[in-house]
Amino acid sequence: MARRGMKFGIFLAPFHRLGENPTLAMARDLELIEWLDWLGYDEAWIGEHHSAGWEVIASPELAIAQAAERTRNIMLGSGVTSLPYHHPFLVAQRFVQLDHMTRGRVMLGCGPGALPSDAYMLGIEPVHLRRRMEESLDAIIRLLRCDERVTMSTDWFEMREAKLHLAPYSDPRFHIAVASTITPFGMVAAGRHGLGVLSIGAGLPGGPEAMASQWKIAEDTAAQHGATMNRKDWRIVVGMHIAEDDEKALRQVKAGERHETTSYFEETLGRVPGTSDDPVRDGVKALTTVVGSPETAIRVIERLSAASGGGFGGVLFRAHEWATREQTMKSYELFARYVMPYFQGAAAPLIESAAWVRENRRRVMSNNVEAVRRAFTDTGRSVPDEMKYRTVGAQDVEPAADD
């Protein structure tokens, strides 16, 4: 189906609770991407982490390479590549190779690195991460143009007359997006080059209210650098779980969400515990979480779009295992069946067609009743009583006597 309107996908860190078999956890991640591809989701962004136990994928490139062989249409991105941890020439080379191997289905997500413990083990002071990311991103953008030999020298990498010997498969290059939280850094980095944005901060307290002002930072920065921002390349990342009704969805995720938040974010990463007695329900009200029925999901996404001050191009669901495997897979199916068509326009022509036939039924269908009647009477047979009432259009036509 040709894509119109909003795009949907997942932001797959991934999150897997401690004590589980990590081999099976990664297998489930790939299974999920296959399922999303079959359901018609647009994108899957896969994370890079190196410590703290829960987020087990160290190389999104390796996961993308395997997922590409098991899927047909879904776009596959790094969500995100921690640029300060890698030489920019090698990042550019790897993603150009993936661009060819996937025939244009790869995307590069960029960030400074999410876990301080990763940077600590690599001997990088957190205060240098954002500067390093900017330097790396500048180098990658120049390399991907393939129109010059790039010489750069920083305190952590050097390039001497560097030029990619393999140009991107995509024209002019694959899509690049920058992760943005509640600080202005990500929007500034994206604005400097006119890149896409992954607003992870939309799922944090205070995030939705700040979205419009954050986007303005990107637009203002782009104008200063002769670039242009496009809202179609802006994706909002939120938690999601869908069931047949709101209370069922809330029940299914309550224990799993509490375990993830308490065990990982509070006890392991040191985030200050929240004060809400029902954080998921309150998150739905605050637009930081989409948990409920398909109808609730539509309302929350529409409110998020309004809060953004002009709309955005897509919604990514922060993949989690708050519910059981079966409930989680069903959640993605329900969203694909009942929410995606609303925002992508797939259901509108069908609804309009049904409404037109309903409104014009007497005029359009009445001749069919006569045609069916004559199919019997013209051969000298009586019209069966059942046909007089079951024929399409019979509701609006008085039964006629047989000729």
Residue locations for each model-derived region?
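Internal, glycine-rich beta/alpha segment that forms the wall or movable "lid"
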Residues: 2-6, 87-195, 209-212, 216, ...
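Glycine-rich, proline-tolerant flexible connector loops at the mouths of alpha/beta enzymes
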Residues: 43-67, 82, 114, 201-208, ...
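Aromatic-lined glycan-binding groove of carbohydrate-active enzymes
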Residues: 185-191, 196, 211-219, 223, ...
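Conserved, mostly hydrophobic/aromatic
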Residues: 8, 36, 40, 48, ...
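Hydrophobic faces of well-ordered beta-strands that scaffold small-molecule active sites
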Residues: 8-12, 44-46, 76-78, 106-110, ...
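Active-site mouth loops of central-metabolism enzymes
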Residues: 12-27, 81-89, 170-182, 243, ...
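N-terminal beta1-alpha1-beta2 module of alpha/beta enzyme domains
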Residues: 1-76, 173-174, 354-356, 369, ...
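A short, acidic, amphipathic alpha-helical segment used as a generic capping/interface helix at domain edges
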Residues: 292-308
